[in-house]
């Protein structure tokens, strides 16, 4: 075409400007330096920052997890699904476990001195508050009076005081439950109060609405002081030494949050002083979130100062500094070359700093701007990318024309229909209607391994793909995290012991750099394992997505969606797990044929959602017809449990202990008939004066009956 063109990366473009205007340009730091600096600060340096240490301990103890309002969910089960994977182990448990040197604690073991896990974020706040202030307590200690088993939430052992936390609003309502369930909940609350009154035991109460107004801990302190409880706060340094320094994973979740926070703040050109003011200007009526942001800043700002000092001492700048400096140089000194057109590829990954650099160049050259990208595939927020610069394009560039390329050649139309419906559940994604000439029934297949046979299921899945398509094809194994392959290679039980190693025996060679995986019996099949982030832009004949479980480090990863990060975006995203949703869309669309989803029993929120669509197949022992949903929480599964004391079998919810619904009639699993009146019990055979009939398991609260003749 005879056009003079120059192709470059943002990295090279920015550094070229710095080299042109500066005689001795600084070197660019290794991208791992930030992570190393944060880790070093949290391990050692923080001990020399009293205010940072105090805020960090308080943040980790009471503010790391956000107690969302119950009415933000359609059911208790939806809330439990979203919160699943949160570490509900108390600080007291972590402290004494590290003191004793033993951490072999079953995750579901409750009410023990070491291994103590509570049932909600608010209970965790209360337990940690009591421990930090030296108030001895027992969690769910059996109440010593009365005929029926009753376990109040907390018992203050030195003061003979009981404490209950009720999930009600200011009007004494539990609107997050169904009408019948709310009535039961409120009735039980009154019964508990009456029991304490009858036996003249002291009961203190806290409520969920306290936390909404960020007065939970203040109210708790006030009540305890009025009741004569003496506070003897533990040393923050002692807490830190016993818990954080002794447990390498305890602070791991916060490192990722701080990394994203620093990258985004630097990309926006916010220095330490500017960040403090920015956060103050962002305050809302939500006092809990305001306090949370303040605590976070108290220890994040010293880390930023430390990181900048390390860069300065090494004579280096990081990528964000480089782009910001280049933009400032263009603004102050002008441009080195005039452009007629600036074309940006992969525009969905643009950051505030990169956009500022391009804007400075455009304003001085009059260049037309052409941006090519797909907002459905914006997955690099942790490096500073800001999707709103794409989705709100006109707001930032003014008059523009938008063109859609909606013809695709990789995926079948059936897979496009599923993946497009999934990604557009986020209303902030641009609406598109992609089309393909390829047709393929059931492009999504589910396989359901349990904790003992994930390796076997993966091998069987590969066998099926080879049997249907031959050995000369490319199979891509995808994981949300790099350790997802380890999950299927080395199966472990709840205590972490290796219980199956089948796939490891099959692995003849694995190249971590390229992802190439050679399995015995499949030597001629091109198999690779990579993370979903690394798969962007790639494709394969068939794709298997591993380890799709609902967990903190599952898919979605629940640590990437923190509101502190959203504040630094040009337009915060309201959709829960928005970036993780885009990442899952990328995973679904890498295949030219089928995508196979390996979903354990505790399956991903995303795979549950896709099962509400059409064009998929389910294989494996967890077929939908075999499962009975818990009518109380809506999303748990009813399973047979056994009373550890009596040995008697009963039916309980898979969400236990967070959903404690249970039934004595195990026959409801073979023929479940949901009670049409209360819709939380089941109809079972009963004997009456006139013979057999069907009655509700919630009797006497629900008196619905049905004659067997009907």
Where are these regions (language model features)?
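Helicase P-loop NTPase motor core
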Residues: 399-401, 408-521, 535
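Helicase C-terminal subdomain and adjacent C-terminal extension
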Residues: 565-575, 579-671, 679, 690
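Conserved P-loop NTPase-based nucleic-acid remodeling module centered on helicase motor cores
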Residues: 2-65, 197-256, 531
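Accessory N-terminal region flanking or inserted into the helicase ATPase core
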Residues: 61-115, 235-341
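Conserved helicase C-terminal RecA-like lobe
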Residues: 83-85, 471-474, 486, 496, ...
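Conserved RecA-like helicase ATPase core segment
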Residues: 180, 193-194, 355-442
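Conserved helicase NTPase motor core
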Residues: 1, 6, 88-102, 111-112, ...
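Short beta-strand-loop-alpha-helix junction that forms the active-site gateway
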Residues: 151-189, 363, 375-377
């Amino acid at each position: 075409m005879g056009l003079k063109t120059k192709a470059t990366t943002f990295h090279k473009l920015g550094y070229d400007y710095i080299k042109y205007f500066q005689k001795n340009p600084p070197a660019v730091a290794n991208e791992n330096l930030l992570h190393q600096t944060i880790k070093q600060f949290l391990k050692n340096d923080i001990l020399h920052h009293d205010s940072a240490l105090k805020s960090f301990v308080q943040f980790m103890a009471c503010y790391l997890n956000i107690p969302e309002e119950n009415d933000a969910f359609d059911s208790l089960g939806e809330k439990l699904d979203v919160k699943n994977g949160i570490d509900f182990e108390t600080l007291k448990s972590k402290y004494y476990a590290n003191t004793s040197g033993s951490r072999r604690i079953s995750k579901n073991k409750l009410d023990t001195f070491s291994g103590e896990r509570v049932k909600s974020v608010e209970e965790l706040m209360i337990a940690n508050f009591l421990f930090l202030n030296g108030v001895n307590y027992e969690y769910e200690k059996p109440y010593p009076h009365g005929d029926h088993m009753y376990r109040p939430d907390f018992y203050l052992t030195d003061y003979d005081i009981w404490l209950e936390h009720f999930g009600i609003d200011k009007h004494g309502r539990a609107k997050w439950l169904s009408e019948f369930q709310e009535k039961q909940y409120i009735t039980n609350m009154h019964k508990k109060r009456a029991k304490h009154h009858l036996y003249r035991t002291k009961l203190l109460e806290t409520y969920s609405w306290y936390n909404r107004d960020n007065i939970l801990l203040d109210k708790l302190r006030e009540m305890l002081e009025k009741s004569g409880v003496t506070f003897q706060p533990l040393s923050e340094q002692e807490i830190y030494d016993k818990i954080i320094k002794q447990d390498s994973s305890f602070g791991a979740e916060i490192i990722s949050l701080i990394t994203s926070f620093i990258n985004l703040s630097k990309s926006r050109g916010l220095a330490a002083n500017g960040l403090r003011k920015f956060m103050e200007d962002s305050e809302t009526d939500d006092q809990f979130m305001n306090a949370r942001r303040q605590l976070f800043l108290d220890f994040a700002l010293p880390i930023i100062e430390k990181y900048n000092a390390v860069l300065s001492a090494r004579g280096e700048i990081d990528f964000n500094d480089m782009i910001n400096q280049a933009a400032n140089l263009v603004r102050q000194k002008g441009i080195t070359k005039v452009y007629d057109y600036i074309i940006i590829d992969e525009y969905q990954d643009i950051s505030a700093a990169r956009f500022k650099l391009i804007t400075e160049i455009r304003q001085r050259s009059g260049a037309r701007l052409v941006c090519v990208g797909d907002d459905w595939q914006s997955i690099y927020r942790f490096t500073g990318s800001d999707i709103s610069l794409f989705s709100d394009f006109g707001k930032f560039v003014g008059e523009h024309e938008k063109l859609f390329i909606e013809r695709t050649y990789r995926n079948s139309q059936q897979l496009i229909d599923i993946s497009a419906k999934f990604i557009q559940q986020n209303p902030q994604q641009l609406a598109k209607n992609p089309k393909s000439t390829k047709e393929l029934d059931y492009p999504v297949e589910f396989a359901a391994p349990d904790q003992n046979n994930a390796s076997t299921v993966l091998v069987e899945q590969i066998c099926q793909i080879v049997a249907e398509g031959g050995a000369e094809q490319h199979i891509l194994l995808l994981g949300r995290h790099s350790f997802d392959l380890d999950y299927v290679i080395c199966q472990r039980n709840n205590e972490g012991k290796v219980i199956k190693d089948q796939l490891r025996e099959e692995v003849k060679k694995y190249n971590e750099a390229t992802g190439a995986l050679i399995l015995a019996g499949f030597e001629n099949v091109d198999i690779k394992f990579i993370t979903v982030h690394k798969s962007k832009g790639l494709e394969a004949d068939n794709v298997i997505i591993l380890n799709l479980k609902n967990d903190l480090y599952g898919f979605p990863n629940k640590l990437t969606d923190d509101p502190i990060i959203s504040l630094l975006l040009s337009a915060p995203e309201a959709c829960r797990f928005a970036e993780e949703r885009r990442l899952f869309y990328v995973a679904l669309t890498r295949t030219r044929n089928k995508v196979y989803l390996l979903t354990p029993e505790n399956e991903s929120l995303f795979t549950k959602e896709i099962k509400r669509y059409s064009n998929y197949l389910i294989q494996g022992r967890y077929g939908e017809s075999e499962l009975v949903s818990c009518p109380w929480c809506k999303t748990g599964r009813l399973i047979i449990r056994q009373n550890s004391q009596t040995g008697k079998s009963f039916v309980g919810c898979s969400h236990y202990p967070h959903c404690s619904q249970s039934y004595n009639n195990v026959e409801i699993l073979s023929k479940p008939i949901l009670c049409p009146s209360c819709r939380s019990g089941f109809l079972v055979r009963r004997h009456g004066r006139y013979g057999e009939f069907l009655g509700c398991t919630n009797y006497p609260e629900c008196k619905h009956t049905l004659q067997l003749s009907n």
